[in-house]
Amino acid sequence: MTLKSLPAWTALQSHFEQIRHARLRDWFAPENDRAPTRAERFTIPGGGLAADFSKNRIDDETLRLLVQLARDAGVEARRDAMFAGEIVNPTEGRAALHTALRATDPQAPFHAQVSAERAKMATFARAVRSGTWTGYTGKRIRHVINIGIGGSDLGPKMVVHALHHVATPEISTHFVSNVDGADLARVLEQVDPEETLAIIVSKTFTTLETMTNARSLRDWFVARGCPEDALAKHFVGVSANPAEVVKFGIAADNVFEMWDWVGGRYSLWSAVGLSIMIAIGPEQFDELLAGANDMDRHFREAPLERNLPVLLGLIGIWYRNFFGSQSYLVAPYSEALHYLPSYLQQLEMESNGKSARLDGTFVDYPTSAVTWGEPGTNGQHAFFQMLHQGPTIVPIDFIAVLTPEHPLASHHPKLLANCFAQSEALMLGRTLEEARKVAGPGKEALAPHLTFPGNRPTTTLLVDALTPRTLGALIALYEHKVLVQATVWDINPFDQWGVELGKILGKVVEADLSAESVDPAKHDSSTTALIERARAALKR
């Protein structure tokens, strides 16, 4: 059966018409919000986190029908198939076993292989952290440069930044992803080649951006005095293609393996996370894995009605497919989680930005929403105006860390107050009558500008303290949310064919930029004109 023919979908359409104009402030009114309160009913713990869903435009019947939709769509079966190592990525004929990277059960798929590679990572990380692994002049490593793009960059960068408070102060970690040379050049201004280790991360070891940066970095080392036969002290590779790593010039002993049954955007738990392990240490890296495993167990064992990834995914579908929301916002009220929104952009949109169903037919309903965000309170002074008073409804995930990870504890009540107040203001709004009172006598014309529609939906995720374990759980929560939505939408969240066409055409355009002339028949007139302008500029 297709999605729109499922009984729960039909029931949700009818229910939506009944509930679409309901007001959150009415549901929270004292005469309606009796024990157990709405907040008590709709706050769910799991995996060391808690989620307050009460400020969403849902009632008990909405959740009942959404959970039934998950059952009708086969969420439980697809979840179990993924954990069992079955082929859940049919377009590439692969399993998706990122969960095996943090499993503790010796019977988990590839357990021995995963454990052996992690032990190799730990030995290397300890050598770098202790100073026993040195550069070619005998100096200890003080800078690590991670070169990768997409999943080989976004996840490790996000985690290293988030866990800065538990990282060693002896080593600075830098991330280079963009093929724009400015990205690498700015990092090279900050480092000494005698004290720098490069981690080159690419599943194929042929990725254009990564290999361009890797070659430039290798040339930089040699130009600054590192003998070519000593580069092994400064380069390691992470790849599913070890032969290509060795061909590049990295010593075979310096190759760490990733596997084709782990997608790039799900890979920070593997050797792709080597920069994380060097920064925070093997023991803390194990805690990161343990937190993800906590959420894995919650996802597998909790009933759907009390299952955080399931509910987060279903509520997202409620807004995307019934309310017609085009985007959703992630607002972590934590500077440590600065890079979480950009990480989630790839996780959500590269996974679920698809139009083809698993059977090859095309969907007739929206799939992935545009995912975006900025840490609080910065966003309040940038785009919250639109969230409060614009005509577009944007569902929001607020993320609040209840205890600070830094010594400036007096800032924290202000941060939390802003987070909670924003969710309350978005829910309550301000009526025209209330606005008239705020405007005051003689300022009737100002009142419409002081109104707030309210009824804007938000979820607040609560993290007691930002530790490797709670961060691991938070990341895994969103990983599993993506699977839930993909299953309901009947799409494959583990491939990314959408990145291919531009890469293919990019090679043609790159060749044309250095050619003597460009055949106008090769491109449309706009692209031809752009190439010609760029050719002229590059010759100057």
UniProtKB/Swiss-Prot annotation:
Source organism phylogeny: Bacteria, Pseudomonadati, Pseudomonadota, Betaproteobacteria, Burkholderiales
Listed GO CC annotations: cytosol
Stored PANTHER family: GLUCOSE-6-PHOSPHATE ISOMERASE
Recorded name of the encoding gene: pgi
Known role: Catalyzes the reversible isomerization of glucose-6-phosphate to fructose-6-phosphate.
Keywords: Cytoplasm, Gluconeogenesis, Glycolysis, Isomerase
Active site per database record: E350 (proton donor), H381, K503
NCBIfam families assigned: PRK00179.1 (NF001211)
GO molecular function, one term: glucose-6-phosphate isomerase activity
Protein name (Swiss-Prot/TrEMBL): Glucose-6-phosphate isomerase
